[in-house]
C-alpha cells in the first residue's frame, strides 16, 4: 500500500511530497498513524542541505521526527499498549546492549540512530518505531503540544540538568527550544531568567512566555541588564542554545564563579573559547544531546500538567499539502513552532 510522505529525494536544497510503501512492523514495534508533525531546526538543515546534512542524511529518505499519532498496529511481543493509544516517541533508537544502555543511561548509547535522520522518519501517514520508544500522551495534553515533545524534551533536559531554584539563569539563543527552556526555568523557580538573541520576533515570543528580560544584544549590553536587575555576582546557570561563538563567550564572561553551563547549541568545531574563564571561575560545562529516556519525558508531561503553558510557542499551522509554506516560515526565522496537520 502506498502512503504520502515528505522525503529528501535529491542531494540539493528542498524536500518533496512523495508516495512510499507503508512501513512494515516487526514483533517489537508499534505502527502509528500520524496526526500532527512539527518542523524541527534539524529538518530545516536537511531542507537547506548544509554541510552537516550532506555528511549525515541518506538520500532518498522520509524525514521528520516531531509527531503525535495513534497506535493502529501492535507487534506480537509488545505489552503495555493498546490500539487507539495516543503516542509521541523518542526519536533516538538505541541498541540496548552497549554499556550505557545496560546501565540505564540510554540517551548516551554510542550506537544511536535517529528517526528521520538515518532511518525512516515521521513526516508520513504512518510510522513504525520500537514500542520501547513510544510515550503515551496523557489525556489533558493537546495534540499540538504532544507533537512538539521532542524539542520540548531538549529544553527540559538542558534546563533541568542543574538545580534552578532561586538561581539566576542566562539563556543564549531564543529559538523555540531556548524559549521553552526559559519557560521551564521560570516555572520551576529560577529567580531571574534572561534570554539573549538578535531576532526581535523571537525575543517577543520569549516575553510572552514570561522571561524576566529578553535582550537584543545588538541594542543592549548584558552587563547593563544585570545591573538593572540588581545582580552583583553573575549568572549561576547558563543554557547555551545558539551554537554562536560570541554568545557562548559572552556567557562565559557573565557567569558567576562556580557556575554551571548546559551546552545544547552546536558551535563550529573550531570555535575559540576563553578557557581562562572556565578554569579560573571553576565552571562546569555539560554537553546535552537528546532527552533522558524516559525521565525527561515524564518531566515534560508533569510540567504541563502542573500548569506550564507552552501554547505561545506554537505560532503556525498548515495542512501537510502546504508543507512548503511551513518550511518557508521556519526558514524565515519569523515563527515559533510550525505544525503540519496530516488528518
UniProtKB/Swiss-Prot annotation:
UniProt-annotated binding residues for NAD(+): 177, 197, 202, 264-266, 288-289
Keywords for the protein's UniProt record, in alphabetical order: Cytoplasm, Metal-binding, NAD, Oxidoreductase, Zinc
Protein name per Swiss-Prot or TrEMBL: L-threonine 3-dehydrogenase
Gene3D superfamilies: Medium-chain alcohol dehydrogenases, catalytic domain, NAD(P)-binding Rossmann-like Domain
Organism: Vibrio atlanticus (strain LGP32) (Vibrio splendidus (strain Mel32))
Lineage summary: Bacteria, Pseudomonadati, Pseudomonadota, Gammaproteobacteria, Vibrionales
Catalytic reactions of this protein: L-threonine + NAD(+) = (2S)-2-amino-3-oxobutanoate + NADH + H(+)
Main localisation: cytoplasm
List of residues binding Zn(2+) 2: 95, 98, 101, 109
Textual note on the cofactor: Binds 2 Zn(2+) ions per subunit.
Catalytic residues, chain numbering: 42, 45
Role, per record: Catalyzes the NAD(+)-dependent oxidation of L-threonine to 2-amino-3-ketobutyrate.
Amino acid at each position: 500500500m502506498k502512503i504520502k510522505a515528505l522525503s529528501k529525494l535529491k542531494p540539493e536544497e528542498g524536500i518533496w511530497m512523495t508516495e512510499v510503501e507503508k512501513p512494515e512492523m516487526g514483533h517489537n514495534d508499534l505502527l502509528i498513524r500520524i496526526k500532527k508533525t512539527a518542523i524541527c531546526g534539524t529538518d530545516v538543515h536537511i531542507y537547506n542541505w548544509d554541510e552537516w546534512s550532506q555528511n549525515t542524511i541518506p538520500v532518498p529518505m522520509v524525514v521528520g521526527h516531531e509527531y503525535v499519532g495513534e497506535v493502529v498496529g501492535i507487534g506480537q511481543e509488545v505489552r503495555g499498549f493498546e490500539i487507539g493509544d495516543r503516542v509521541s516517541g523518542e526519536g533516538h533508537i538505541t541498541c540496548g546492549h552497549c554499556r550505557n544502555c545496560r546501565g540505564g543511561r540510554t540517551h548516551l548509547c554510542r550506537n544511536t540512530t535517529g528517526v528521520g535522520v538515518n532511518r525512516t522518519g515521521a513526516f508520513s501517514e504512518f510510522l513504525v518505531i520500537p514500542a520501547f520508544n513510544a510515550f503515551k500522551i496523557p489525556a489533558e495534553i493537546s495534540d499540538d503540544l504532544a507533537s512538539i515533545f521532542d524539542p520540548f524534551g531538549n529544553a527540559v533536559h538542558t534546563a533541568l540538568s542543574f538545580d534552578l531554584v532561586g538561581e539566576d539563569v542566562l539563556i543564549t539563543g531564543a529559538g523555540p527550544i531556548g524559549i521553552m527552556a526559559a519557560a521551564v526555568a521560570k516555572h520551576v523557580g529560577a529567580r531571574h531568567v534572561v534570554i539573549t538573541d538578535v531576532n526581535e520576533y523571537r525575543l517577543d515570543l520569549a516575553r510572552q512566555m514570561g522571561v524576566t528580560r529578553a535582550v537584543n544584544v545588538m541594542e543592549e549590553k548584558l552587563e547593563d541588564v544585570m545591573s538593572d536587575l540588581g545582580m552583583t555576582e553573575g549568572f549561576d546557570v547558563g543554557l547555551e542554545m545558539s551554537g554562536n561563538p560570541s554568545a557562548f563567550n559572552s556567557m562565559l564572561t557573565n557567569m558567576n564563579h562556580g557556575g554551571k553551563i548546559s551546552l545544547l547549541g552546536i558551535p563550529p568545531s573550531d570555535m575559540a573559547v576563553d578557557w581562562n574563564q572556565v578554569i579560573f571561575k571553576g565552571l562546569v560545562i555539560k554537553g546535552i544531546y537528546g532527552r533522558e529516556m524516559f525521565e525527561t519525558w515524564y518531566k515534560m508531561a508533569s510540567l504541563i500538567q502542573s500548569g506550564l503553558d507552552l501554547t505561545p510557542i506554537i505560532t503556525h499551522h498548515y495542512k501537510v499539502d502546504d508543507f512548503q509554506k511551513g518550511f518557508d516560515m521556519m526558514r524565515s526565522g519569523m515563527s515559533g513552532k510550525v505544525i503540519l496537520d496530516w488528518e
